From Swiss-Prot:
This is Arylacetonitrilase. It comes from Aspergillus oryzae (strain ATCC 42149 / RIB 40) (Yellow koji mold). It catalyses: a nitrile + 2 H2O = a carboxylate + NH4(+); 4-chlorophenylacetonitrile + 2 H2O = 4-chlorophenylacetate + NH4(+). SUPFAM superfamilies: Carbon-nitrogen hydrolase. GO terms for molecular function: arylacetonitrilase activity; hydro-lyase activity.
Length: 333
């Protein structure tokens, strides 16, 4: 049953620094931010990519760091854990929907994951990034089929989430849009200004490049986009040992923002080095204004000519042959 869409939703987008490589302390900070957002009337609060226990910034400076990697595994979050229960309890106590980015530990293998937690403290979905980006593959594994479980029904309407460069995956974006989200959380690590034509890094990985992706997603999907980024301080740079690296080598990285379904900016920015929470009151009826012009899953589409096929089976390590044949099917949207 579809939840009636409220006419206005107050959202909170964090721009904060995790307690690097410290599971317990970052979970405590998460709950404090949830409570702070609730005290300002927020009905939904979003967190960055790998917020717990912080994005592994060192991977862009050196591919192997056994000490930090070991600590990272030990401080990554398990879904069935007292720490996740603590976060769910905070969501319930504060009556807030939480969209959480975290490094997920499954038997000491790690995945870039997101969870959407209801305002009653129930985990509505968990999903994994479909493919770790470039140097992230030195730390994280690929997704399971649950990477497609990206949109759920909530008390404020349909809420979805993707992580980082998933926002340049056309098929994944289309599949997410097809689930009819009204609010989309785009989770990112710290992001920095592009250095200009002499900068060897990619513009698409910069602050302005990723904001362009957020605005594009809002326009394509006719949804509100909560562009959620983290901050790294000088202390964080020292802990990650990234001062000589190409990115995340200086304090900053914050560029959190909120965009309307036509791509317009709805929030006021914080400074890149500033921790805080940005808020916006979303006028949900604005979605109808954009849908009247363009609906890429409706009147502005041609599924008779172009459509998306989705593999629906989950490849487990141990599976009976008959079960394999039964589940190996393709769903067409």
């Amino acid at each position: 049953m579809t939840t009636p869409q409220p006419s206005q939703v107050r959202v909170a987008v964090t721009q904060a620094e995790p307690v690097w490589l410290d599971l317990k302390a970052t979970v405590d900070k998460t709950c404090s931010l949830i409570a702070e957002a609730a005290s300002k009337g927020a009905q939904l609060v979003s967190f960055p990519e790998c917020w717990i226990p912080g994005y592994p910034a060192w991977i862009w400076t050196r591919p192997v760091d056994q000490e930090l990697h070991s600590r990272y595994i030990q401080n990554s979050l398990t879904v069935s854990s007292p720490e996740m229960t603590q976060i769910c309890k905070s969501a319930n106590e504060n009556n807030v929907i939480v969209v959480l980015g975290f490094s997920e530990n499954i038997h000491n293998s790690l995945y870039i994951s997101q969870a959407i937690i209801s305002n009653t403290g129930s985990i509505l979905t968990t999903r994994k990034k479909i493919k770790a980006t470039h140097m992230e593959r030195t730390i994280f594994g690929d997704a399971f089929a649950d990477c497609l479980d990206s949109v759920v029904e909530t008390a404020v309407g349909r809420v979805g989430a993707l992580s980082c460069w998933e926002h340049i995956q056309p098929l994944l974006k289309y599949h997410t849009c097809a689930q009819r989200e009204a609010i989309h959380v785009a989770a990112w690590p710290p992001l920095f200004e592009w250095g200009g034509p002499e900068d060897e890094s990619l513009f698409s990985m910069s602050r302005d490049g990723t904001i362009a992706l957020a605005r594009t997603y809002a326009i394509e999907s006719s949804s509100f986009v909560l562009h959620t980024t983290a901050v790294i301080s000088q202390e964080g740079v020292e802990k990650m040992r990234t001062a000589t690296g190409a990115i995340m080598n200086m304090p900053g990285g914050g560029s959190s923002a909120i965009f309307g379904p036509d791509g317009r900016l709805l929030s006021k920015p914080l400074l890149p080095t500033e921790e805080g929470i940005i808020y916006a009151d979303l006028e949900m009826h604005d979605i109808y204004k954009t849908k009247a012009f363009v609906d890429v899953l409706g009147h502005y589409s041609r599924p008779d000519l172009l459509w998306l096929g989705v593999g629906s089976c989950d490849r487990r390590h141990v599976k009976e042959d008959a079960e394999e044949r039964r589940e190996d099917r393709v769903e067409v949207l």
